[in-house]
Amino acid sequence: MCDAGTLKEHDTALCGSHCFTCLPQNEFVLIRVIRVLFSALRFNVATQKIIEMFRIEKISSFDSPELQPYATMKRPLEHERQGIFVAEGVKVVRRLLESHFAVASVVLPEKWLETFRPLIEARPEQITVYLAEKKFLEGLVGFSMFQGVLAVGKIPLPISLDDILQKSPPPRLFVAVDALTNAENLGALVRNCVAFGVQALIVGETSSSPFLRRAVRNSMGTIFQLPVIEVGTARCAVRSSQRDDPTHHSLSQTLRDLRAHGLRCIAAHPHTDQRILSQADFSNDCCIVFGSEGDGISVSVLEACDEAVAIPMPPAVDSLNVGAAAAVFLYETSRQRGCA
């Protein structure tokens, strides 16, 4: 009942029996319980709407065939044959969901569901969302994870060289990689490409796929913004069979075709006397070629380039990490084009 000492101006005769202050304690508790139940009902209705827009499954077993892409993450050739890749981490998965890439499924701890719900709801396709504890997911994939957020995306169909040339306004800027097999370095190079406005990445037949999990992770999801041409690989041949565009058989032939279209092909080579970086001209259409840190650019690819250019360094340093070298070359290109 009312506490006259606390509420001196309260008049029970005027307020009526519906005043919370005048209600008996048990009736007040009952009203609070009803409110809690009503809020829970509204939450359940909202959750049901989410489930209708994308499928949610709580998983507790590794046996589901839909989870195989996550269980086989250490077998990348299987993913390449299926034309899929795995995105790992909150930022990378978010960028995948924001991209035009098709998404098959998402796996995450339940605490992340509300974070990703708007992005998943906005997708044109229905996505299956698997919920599980992070420790369970680590057992599924076979390694420790910081956030436990993963997604399976679909590698897009190959893009032809003619398509890229038609869609890229001048001055064109492409990057090609030869024998770059380290996925982390390839991912870092992709990130630099997007940062400096590269219009396409050409991946040679002896390089790793930029859609390997570690490459995608190190690119921080920027691979979803960069058109990729893969030449002369079995994975490219499989995907090319799904469309009529011919696939080039080698990086050296692709570079010759670029030169025929007026692009200057410039090899980033640490041991050349031809020209140093500040003397090279990047102001017009060009393709910059990078090789592996161990073996550099192959002879056949070097011969297909117009010239080789070096970053000047003291004798004690024979080369830079390919990601660092790409950043230096691409910054110089941006500077010459007035974009730096």
Regions found by a protein language model. Give the residues of each.
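Intrinsic disorder/low-complexity segments
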Residues: 1-53, 167, 229-253, 260, ...
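Boundary-proximal intrinsically disordered activation/regulatory segments immediately upstream
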Residues: 51-111
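A glycine-rich helix N-cap at a beta->alpha junction
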Residues: 125-141
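Structured adenosyl-cofactor binding patch, chiefly the S-adenosyl-L-methionine
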Residues: 148, 192-196, 210-223, 299-340
